[in-house]
């Protein structure tokens, strides 16, 4: 499968360990918020989906908690890249969750990828954007498959 090959998965996992490992817990909120800021800069309409978690008050605990939940979902997906069956089950679960949320659109996942590809290289010394593009596409394609 050349869409997120074994080499790509290795690169993504290696990059991710350097970004999201336990030693960096203090910066997780900042990284997550930077990703969302970039998403909202790309598409201000995406903000509307997050009204119930205080998106307009980035210093509020409920927004920070939501940011961490989203990035932890990415963390889980990235760490399941080597286990395709478990990954598929997790992505189906995430797809269901996103289908049930009013206003979530497939295009937001494309924009989230652009945001990730802009922010993550700033916190990873050897970021492989090609591998991330291919593997995030594999993840996002399942989640957004039934979204408008």
Swiss-Prot record:
Q: Pfam family example for this protein?
A: Globin
Name the InterPro entries on file: Globin, Globin-like_OT, Globin-like_sf, Globin/Proto, Haemoglobin_extracell, Mb-like_M
State where heme b binds. 98
Identify the PROSITE patterns for this entry. GLOBIN (PS01033)
| Domain (Globin): residue spans on this chain | 3-148
Q: Which GO terms describe its molecular function?
A: heme binding; iron ion binding; oxygen binding; oxygen carrier activity
Tell me which GO cellular component terms the UniProt record holds.
extracellular region; hemoglobin complex
Keyword annotations: Disulfide bond, Heme, Iron, Metal-binding, Oxygen transport, Secreted, Transport
Secreted among keywords: yes
Family statement drawn from the similarity comment of this UniProt entry: Belongs to the globin family.
Q: What else is known?
A: Giant hemoglobins of worms are formed of a monomeric subunit and a disulfide-bonded trimer.
Report the protein name in the record: Extracellular globin-2B
Q: Which organism is it from?
A: Tylorrhynchus heterochetus
């Amino acid at each position: 499968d050349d869409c997120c090959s074994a080499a790509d998965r290795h690169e993504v996992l290696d990059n991710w360990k350097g970004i999201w490992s336990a030693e960096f817990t203090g910066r997780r909120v900042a990284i997550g918020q930077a990703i969302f800021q970039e998403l909202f800069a790309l598409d201000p309409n995406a903000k509307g989906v997050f009204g119930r978690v205080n998106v307009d008050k980035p210093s509020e605990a409920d927004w920070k908690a939501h940011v961490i939940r989203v990035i932890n979902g990415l963390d889980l997906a990235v760490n399941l890249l080597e286990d395709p069956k478990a990954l598929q089950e997790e992505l189906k679960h995430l797809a269901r969750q996103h289908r049930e949320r009013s206003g979530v659109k497939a295009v937001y996942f494309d924009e989230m990828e652009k945001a990730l590809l802009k922010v993550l290289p700033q916190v990873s010394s050897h970021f492989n954007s090609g591998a991330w593009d291919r593997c995030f596409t594999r993840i996002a394609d399942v989640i957004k498959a039934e979204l408008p």
